Amino acid sequence: QFTPTESQKFVFEYGKNNQVHTLTPGESLDAWTMRGNLKQPNSKRETHNSRSHWVAAWNAQGEILHPEIAVYQEKVIREVKSGKKDKYNHWDLNYESRKPEITNTIIDAKVTAFLPENVLTIGGQFQHAELRDDSATGKKTTETQSVSVKQKAVFIENEYAATDSLALTGGLRLDNHEIYGSYWNPRLYAVYNLTDNLTLKGGIAKAFRAPSIREVSPGFGTLTQGGASIMYGNRDLKPETSVTEEIGIIYNNDRGFSASATLFNTDFKNKLTSYDIGTKDPVTGLNTFIYDNVGEANIRGVELATQIPVNDKWRVSANYTFTDSRRESDDESLNGKSLKGEPLERTPRHAANAKLEWDYTQDITFYSSLNYTGKQIWAAQRNGAKVPRVRNGFTSMDIGLNYQILPDMLINFAVLNVTDRKSEDIDTIDGNWQVDEGRRYWANVRVSF
């Protein structure tokens, strides 16, 4: 950080992260996978993820105006090594040919004006995303290609203090996508302090999500289904649009106790999917898959959360979410049957977690957490079965510690899924589709300067 004057600040940041995720048969994943009646040994897989980023930002604080501008860029590269044991019982791993590389650049600018009974914000954003990856050009050959897309937005938002207890916020955002054109997205929110400890808040917002670069590039073919098929992007895709309403109530006191309940409802359309169009690709001779928009859907539910200070050193936090999701149109089918009324894929009806924290000293905190994910149903067109597949719920436990070893250095260590709990074996007939991660160890060092 650089502060040339009391009212101005320049911020510069650079970071680089490298992560290796290893899945070993018989340890962090099942040794075998059942595909129908066929038992197949799993391969060992190492995923190397490299992420670098930089930030340059400036802000100023005047008596009325607070301007800000920031430029962000991140580059993510993924490399995968996989293989099976050789005749000497040693793992023979080789890098796969694909090496996806994504570069995201974002420029944000806004100015906030603190006016009598109003806080007005006006701003804009520019995004540029570029993807370099393999694209199939022949049955056994690939070629590295590069595609990019730009997106711009301007927005205005105003928070109005209607009374000492009521604040109203209204906003309007105009998104302009290089492919999809312009979309208006309004937002309205209200916060009402019923008492000093009890707050009621709620609102409604419209949003849209554009498909990824790969999904909208018709000349970009990616092998799928183990190389048996090829999937092309679709320039005619529409972005997913949604309208969300929520209302919640929050209680907190000066002793650190808090509790909240929130009801939410989201309706969206143009859900993104992919499927086999039933023809052979003229270039590769493989089965052809395509991305498309289908159907309307609804997600609604309730979220409950609380934080309880037991004493000065112990505290408990917990939350629970009930989610009811369903498809509301009959333009999706599985094995000739409409999926209308089926839940959205991989969306658990029940999810909960609880965490216990203990401040052993001022600098060391131990914690333990329980995490529950309920039963999930995968009823999509490409679920690998002829009927909706069911994945049973399961509970896992994590333990860890945070250690402020120096004023500017924080160490985090955790054992995830400490009991090595797993849901169930893969069953492509009508059951589980996901291999669970076993016990993992995680460590992080954060240095501030």
Q: What is each residue range found by the language model?
A:
Residues 269, 372-381, 402-449:
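C-terminal beta-signal and adjacent terminal beta-strands/loops
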Residues 5-7, 13, 117, 145-269, ...:
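Structural signature of Gram-negative outer-membrane beta-barrels, strongest in the C-terminal barrel
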Residues 49, 73, 88-168:
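Outer-membrane beta-barrel transmembrane domain signature of Gram-negative proteins
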Residues 104-110, 145-147, 151-155, 234, ...:
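Outer membrane beta-barrel strand-and-loop segments of large Gram-negative receptors
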Residues 16-20, 62-64, 73-77, 115-117, ...:
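Transmembrane beta-strands of outer-membrane beta-barrel pores
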Residues 161-165, 260, 264-267, 286-381, ...:
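Gram-negative outer-membrane beta-barrel transporters
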Residues 5-67, 73-102:
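Flexible loop and strand-edge segments within Gram-negative outer membrane beta-barrel domains
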